[in-house]
Every structure is written in C-alpha cells, then in structure tokens.
Amino acid sequence: MAAAVGRLLRASVARHVSAIPWGISATAALRPAACGRTSLTNLLCSGSSQAKLFSTSSSCHAPAVTQHAPYFKGTAVVNGEFKDLSLDDFKGKYLVLFFYPLDFTFVCPTEIVAFSDKANEFHDVNCEVVAVSVDSHFSHLAWINTPRKNGGLGHMNIALLSDLTKQISRDYGVLLEGSGLALRGLFIIDPNGVIKHLSVNDLPVGRSVEETLRLVKAFQYVETHGEVCPANWTPDSPTIKPSPAASKEYFQKVNQ
C-alpha cells in the first residue's frame, strides 16, 4: 500500500515523502517540518503537476443536495454472492450510499462493520445501505471472508459495490484523480432518487452511523408531517411548524 500511495507524490515530491499511511491525512503527511518538506498548500497553489495529483473529479459537475443522484450500475457482493446492482434497484426506498478509499485498510472496516451492524435499523425505516470503493468485487469478497479480528469484515448485512472503473466515484465528485481513490463521501438519497444530504470526509476520519440514521429519520419525518426538525432533533423531540405564528409554539416550549 505504501508503494501505491507513494505514486501520489511523483517527481520532486517523491524524494521527500515515501508513503502516506492510511491513518494520516494527505495534509498532515506533507505538513512543513524541521527538515523543510514542501507543504501540500504550496503544492496546490503552485499549479504544478504534483498539485494536480490531489485534485478531485470536476467539482462543477459534482451532484448537489436537491438534485437527482447520478445513475450507477456495477457488480456488488450481496450476502456473499456477486450481483448486479444499480440505482434503479432502490426506487421507492431511501438509500445511504457511502464511499471509502480501499479494502484491507484501517478506518474503512470500522465504518463498514458499524453500518452492517445497524442494517436492521435502516431497514426498519425503509432504507438500504451500500458501500462503494474502487476495488474489484473479488477483493470485496476476499475482505468479507477475512475474520474481523484480522482486519476483515466477516458476514455483511449490506452490499459492497465495486467501482473498478472509478466512474461512480467520479460521477459523485469524490474521486481523487491522482491516486484513483475515493474520499469518504456519504449520500442520502430519497425514494425519488433525489439527494437529501451529502458529506465528504478526508481519509483519516470515519463517519457516524448514528448520525446518518438520525438524518434519514429526520427527512422522513419532514415528508410525513410537514414540520421541520431543529438542531439535534431526535424522533422523541419536538419539531417546528414552518410559519412565523405557528413556530412560536416550539420556541415557547423549549425556552421555558
């Protein structure tokens, strides 16, 4: 893996940095130190070929909240078997589509296992979860067949989708073009195929499954009740009627 990541930093940068471990962000790995290593900020501002290695796929074409999610189709591992999977398979359901950098890494299995362990709670609210990386479906299966105590995934209750061509990651605006890896992008897509939420993390930090589930429930509540959800809303907390007069009911209740 060190060799693969090292290809991110070709030419002069490669003389200073031999690898970026997956527990460290690209920004941290290139932070100026006493030895005078070049900072990532300088690389990005220089317009050099090295800087382009860290650019993502064209942000001007990246999907946005309220827009329809880009169509995708590929081979996934579902219940230990290979299966064709597309966005059309989730019509009428909510979908959490989350991207991760690579199989057999460090933060990634913690996220995937956490989502898998909560799969039934997502199913209870008519929501499916799909994880995506640029690995092959064969790699996904090998990782699933690796015990968790050895960094593997074990039995999975969610689908792992292969994006070997990198087109899905590119279409969703999370592909790091130089390395060919995807950032930790997460998209909540409603039953009509519309993006309700998106977030993108740098490589070293995993995401909250509980927060993702809370957001799905919040969007569903708004659709069902026509009221809006305040900060830190949970299903047992009050909501707001979206009008100047009616909203006072909420503010009076929480500011007693």
Curated annotation (Swiss-Prot):
Primary localization: mitochondrion
Broad EC category: oxidoreductase
Enzyme Commission designation: 1.11.1.24
Assembly information from the UniProt record: Homodimer; disulfide-linked, upon oxidation. 6 homodimers assemble to form a ring-like dodecamer. Interacts with NEK6. Interacts with LRRK2. Interacts with MAP3K13. Interacts with RPS6KC1 (via PX domain).
Modified residues (N6-acetyllysine): 91
Gene Ontology BP terms: cell redox homeostasis; cellular response to oxidative stress; cellular response to reactive oxygen species; hydrogen peroxide catabolic process; maternal placenta development; mitochondrion organization; myeloid cell differentiation; negative regulation of apoptotic process
Transit peptide residue numbers: 1-61
Protein name: Thioredoxin-dependent peroxide reductase, mitochondrial
A GO cellular component entry from the record: cytosol
Catalytic site: 108
N6-succinyllysine: residues carrying this PTM: 83, 91
SUPFAM superfamilies, sorted: Thioredoxin-like
Single GO MF descriptor: NADH-dependent peroxiredoxin activity
Entry PTM: Phosphorylated by LRRK2; phosphorylation reduces perodixase activity.
InterPro entries in alphabetical order: AhpC/TSA, Peroxiredoxin, Peroxiredoxin_C, Thioredoxin-like_sf, Thioredoxin_domain
Impact noted for substituting residue 202 to N: In SCAR32; unstable protein leading to its degradation, reduced glutathione peroxidase activity and reduced PRDX5 protein levels in patient fibroblasts
Disorder named in the UniProt entry: Spinocerebellar ataxia, autosomal recessive, 32: A form of spinocerebellar ataxia, a clinically and genetically heterogeneous group of cerebellar disorders due to degeneration of the cerebellum with variable involvement of the brainstem and spinal cord. SCAR32 is characterized by the onset of gait ataxia in the second or third decades of life. Other classic features include upper limb ataxia, oculomotor signs, dysphagia, and dysarthria. Some patients may have hyper- or hypokinetic movement abnormalities. Brain imaging shows cerebellar atrophy.
Localization per record: Mitochondrion; Cytoplasm; Early endosome
PROSITE patterns: THIOREDOXIN_2
Modified residues (Phosphothreonine): 146
